[in-house]
Amino acid sequence: MVDSVGFAEAWRAQFPDSEPPRMELRSVGDIEQELERCKASIRRLEQEVNQERFRMIYLQTLLAKEKKSYDRQRWGFRRAAQPPDGAAEPRASAPRLPPAPADGADPAPVEESEARPDGEGSPSKGRPATARRPAAAAPADRDDRGPPTSVAALRSNFEKIRKGPAQPGSADAEKPFYVNVEFHHERGLVKVNDKEVSDRISSLGSQAMQMERKKSQQSAGQGLGEAPRPHYRGRSSESSCGLDGDYEDAELNPRFLKDNLINANGGNRPPWPPLEYQPYQSIYVGGMMVEGEGKSPLLRSQSTSEQEKRLTWPRRSYSPRSFEDSGGGYTPDCSSNENLTSSEEDFSSGQSSRVSPSPTTYRMFRDKSRSPSQNSQQSFDSSSPPTPQCQKRHRQCQVVVSEATIVGVRKTGQIWPSDGDSTFQGEADSSFGTPPGYGCAADQAEEQRRHQDGLPYIDDSPSSSPHLSSKGRGSPASGALEPTKASELDLEKGLEMRKWVLSGILASEETYLSHLEALLLPMKPLKAAATTSQPVLTSQQIETIFFKVPELYEIHKEFYDGLFPRVQQWSHQQRVGDLFQKLASQLGVYRAFVDNYGVAMETAEKCCQANAQFAEISENLRARSNKDVKDSTTKNSLETLLYKPVDRVTRSTLVLHDLLKHTPSSHPDHSLLQDALRISQNFLSSINEEITPRRQSMTVKKGEHRQLLKDSFMVELVEGARKLRHIFLFTDLLLCTKLKKQSGGKTQQYDCKWYIPLTDLSFQMVDELEALPNIPLVPDEELDALKIKISQIKSDIQREKRANKGSKVMERLRKKLSEQESLLLLMSPSMAFRVHSRNGKSYTFLISSDYERAEWRESIREQQKKCFKSFSLTSVELQMLTNSCVKLQTVHHIPLTINKEDDESPGLYGFLHAIVHSATGFKQSSNLYCTLEVDSFGYFVNKAKTRVYRDTTEPNWNEEFEIELEGSQTLRILCYEKCYNKMKMAKEDGESADKLMGKGQVQLDPQTLQDRDWQRTVIDMNGIEVKLSVKFTSREFSLKRMPSRKQTGVFGVKIAVVTKRERSKVPYIVRQCVEEIERRGMEEVGIYRVSGVATDIQALKAAFDVNNKDVSVMMSEMDVNAIAGTLKLYFRELPEPLFTDEFYPNFAEGIALSDPVAKESCMLNLLLSLPEANLLTFLFLLDHLKRVAEKETVNKMSLHNLATVFGPTLLRPSEKESKLPANPSQPITMTDSWSLEVMSQVQVLLYFLQLEAIPAPDSKRQSILFSTEV
């Protein structure tokens, strides 16, 4: 049994009123189990405490509001009258008294005594009460990084004021109630929304703060014992477990040694500054923010009654101390925030679930106060290593809402831009879909770290974006200038842009230098300690970890010192090319750093494991974030900072590209910058291969890596609703995420929906499918209506491009196109792909391609062979993994045509003729068939299926299919074994019971297929080879109705000629085919849609052309799909469509009428105006198609499906009516006008199919129609 000496005695000494718990600790396993039970208990109790604290805060606030006993000025209300001087004294002098709401004491949740009634038991109770924070901030800001006197600490605890029930329609209800202010303990108010206040206000503030200190001294009296200590940045001064963590013993407290590392060798620690004032006392911070014309936001008071209605209560978050102290602790679930908000979109999840207003709240104000240097800061320093160790320490958010706080790296002296300056407005946020120069590669982990550590969030620089607006600043009439003046103005703008690009580079350099400084800061004391008897690291380890960092710092310091004065003394002829050329010539130092990077990281990890003191130091390196604020620093890990140079060098060419873009070729810098770019590109090409694998992995544990294998957008079926998801397959788990809605300027963010370790994942079998819900299918009519809208919008876009109209119209159309394509992508898939977790949960995806489903299943099964152990992720680990997806993803856009680049091939439009010849390589006799898929509208669709070739290892199908292409680029072929005994077959995912034997694909290259000759190819499928021939017919030729050269046949001969020759009202071929299909094809699945064997169709065509009397015998022996194909071919090859070229435009216009009565009258009159042979043949065929549709439950052919098949066949005009170009890969103009035409033809036929009855114009026609001859 394990000896637990001293536990009972220590327990009784600490808790004299309770007996020590009994613990049976017989082995290490017992200790571990007891520890887990203890942790679970802590998590449960902590959650209960937090919930009760949250409820207490709400009730206190509600009580304060109802009794109107709160400190109105502190809550953002204008003080109506100055209270008596003594009003503040009781509040300061009795902070430890228990709450007494009954007698009117202030119950607002800003009093330490109410929020922490157990404060007496803290070992740090010797500290004065005035040094503590208000309780309203305590639950949410336990990890406050700012000084304890920051008014923003109170402000950050309150959400933006929402519309109250008393004024639902208030216009002001959506505006943020608090502004971003900064206070100094001596000077009072120093900044409002990051703008320094005037000297007069500052002097008044200084006087006010002196008065406050005097009040505080009088009221505190002898309550101030010893001088208080300030809070550590990033730490709470009060521990949730009641322990004081600020011991000055260097051996017992590694954090103390780290924070005082430079003075560790005998230097005296500077004295703590006295804290003799009461925080948050008599300070007005309220008011509405109003946009000014290029000025800082103003403070506007509101009426007391209105403000009282809008008083809100604070949100809360969980204390971070539980994460650190309990080894896992309670963590908020990443899929459902614990912040109790009304919208899951208001907060990031998990680690980033900070108590802050919605990002959109401050968006409008942030954009107004943005300077070029601020906008450009995110250039080189934006990325981070895949798993920064600083993220492993789970911290609470900063009290100042970082979304609303834009702190400049460099003082510029002006606010950019103003209301009247629209140069960058709208552009900075509209270019986020593409990499904007050197400013858009920030990964999500880095952005969250900035929020947490105090480094301000800064949008991508408009000055560095390649998508900058060309509008003149303040010159709305610039479009009316003469061409010469306009070109001069453009040149002037380009040179002006050059300055802003350089300003962004300068800001980026400053941030990068601060990171290198943070790396060098611990290096000196570590080297000094290495010579002592108790070194933290050896000299060799220090040299390995910090290899080449001093040299890099010197190089960039010299570059910055040279660039800064030139930008400050700017002129359009200012030269900077020599500086960039010299910087590029020194990239060899980066080569040495990159080569050593892996060794440095490995050494640092080993040192962290071996030395807790160094581990603490390595996770708390301070980098200066704002040179204008003396103590403004951010906390970074050693891993983060060591990755900065690696990330920096991989982006070096982006800066030069942007600079060259705005440097005229006549400028002296142009050639120098080109030379620098050439050097940088050559250098990068040599190291990219080494860096890419590192960026594609994410650290899981020490020495282990989680690799991304595959990712894709899919549709998930959630409680009957379709949801678009992004699925990531890692080496050990399957992760399902949701792409969060992006407000303007925000980078991509993902929410985790669920994950399954691969060891726990399985595919469901047939006996488990009985309880699965049916897949809701979207009617084909709706899908076709969406396609019509998409084609129409694409045509409108092309028209706008040709007209060169304003970008607003184009953006609106592109947004509408994206919405419609996304909806089509969401609604079209119908093939189930189900995954099952060992815990009993199942998830269903809908896929349009069996090829893609098979790929996912193969990838998962292959990886499962390498996974042997189940695991679970904490919500923080899960959040880190989700954040990494932004950088690791390989599929960056939803597969929409709107996301295609302009130079990307639009695909083929026309008809692909494919002959599936044969297959070899099967090991045993099987019943085999093939299916063909092509891509259309961004997803793959099954287009054709061969007949089943029975009991063979070498099937010879030799079947020809005609497949319509709509922007298609790939042809896929899948080979199956037909399984007739379904009971013996493991039926997975609700798919057909047939077994997939192999799959392959071939690219449809317009250059190869444009000569319209047969192209023979062999597709390899892991040992199985399928022989295939393809031929492409472009729209130009497929639209032609070629008349037959001999008028004795029936194909290609006018219908009137055929009926006259046969002395019938309906052609013999039509009657024969319809009769045979109605005899044995009415229950054939996909009749008229499934292609028949091309050789059979050609044989029937020849027989009808020569009037073979045995044709009826031939038809009885042929596949019914070949007979259906023959009938379609006859109508397709008519020299003039059944609806005639003359009436076709009228039918197209009639179907577009909105009034149903007018439409019916128009369409019937047009129909009855057709030539007699055409009308009677159409009515005969129409009656047959309606009978086919009556068997829809069996043959799956609805009226809409039949209209899709026959519409273009019966209505497509002849060549002379077609004005479409010949290029098969012609962009959207031709393809979409054709698509619209096809959709219109389908709608015309569908209209007649849906009409209950079509009256004949006279009795003569009616008698003819129903004559026995027909």
Swiss-Prot record:
Residues 707-865 form the PH domain. It catalyses: L-seryl-[protein] + ATP = O-phospho-L-seryl-[protein] + ADP + H(+); L-threonyl-[protein] + ATP = O-phospho-L-threonyl-[protein] + ADP + H(+). GO terms for biological process: actin cytoskeleton organization; brain development; cell migration; cellular response to lipopolysaccharide; definitive hemopoiesis; establishment of localization in cell; focal adhesion assembly; homeostasis of number of cells. It is found in: Postsynaptic density; Cell projection, Dendritic spine; Cell projection, Axon; Synapse. Its main location: other. The modification Omega-N-methylarginine is found at residue 473. SUPFAM superfamilies: Bcr-Abl oncoprotein oligomerization domain (SSF69036), C2 domain (Calcium/lipid-binding domain, CaLB) (SSF49562), DBL homology domain (DH-domain) (SSF48065), GTPase activation domain, GAP (SSF48350), PH domain-like (SSF50729). This is Breakpoint cluster region protein. It comes from Rattus norvegicus. The lineage of its organism: Eukaryota, Metazoa, Chordata, Craniata, Vertebrata.
